[in-house]
Amino acid sequence: MNTWVKWYEEVMGFVNFLSFDDKQIHTEYSALMSKVMSNGNGRIKFPLNEPAKGKKKSQIEEYLDFYESPGVQHIAIATDDIIQTVRKLRSRGVEFLSAPPKEYYTAIPTRLGEHMKIMNENIDELEELAILVDADEEGYLLQIFTKPVEDLS
């Protein structure tokens, strides 16, 4: 990982924006280390990750075993209107993971609590599009994940 951090710094002019070690990112069974790289204006950020020793294979090790090489697992983009963006991407052939069970969407008001007052999106529409909702003390987050984009066949 440090080789790639150095490459992005020296060749691309990126900076190491944040770093996390295996004490900060871990479960009972696996852990990882991550260095988040950022371009000069901060509009592009991405993590460089590597597995840390754990009781089981990490998600990174499973990815490497399956694809037999490093690569891009997923890409995050920002949008001011996730509903329109997802509709446009779907119309252009992008496939997303399936929606969680109905109970996930039924529980959103309870999970979001006070954030429901500022949420403008319709829960039925979020469910229809399989958009996920998370919240913390700073606000709420809408997100969706594509199916794997790599094809090794």
Which residues does each predicted region cover?
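Eukaryotic intrinsically disordered and solvent-exposed regulatory patches
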Residues: D22-Q24
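Glyoxalase I/VOC metalloenzyme domain signal
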Residues: M1-F17, H26-S153
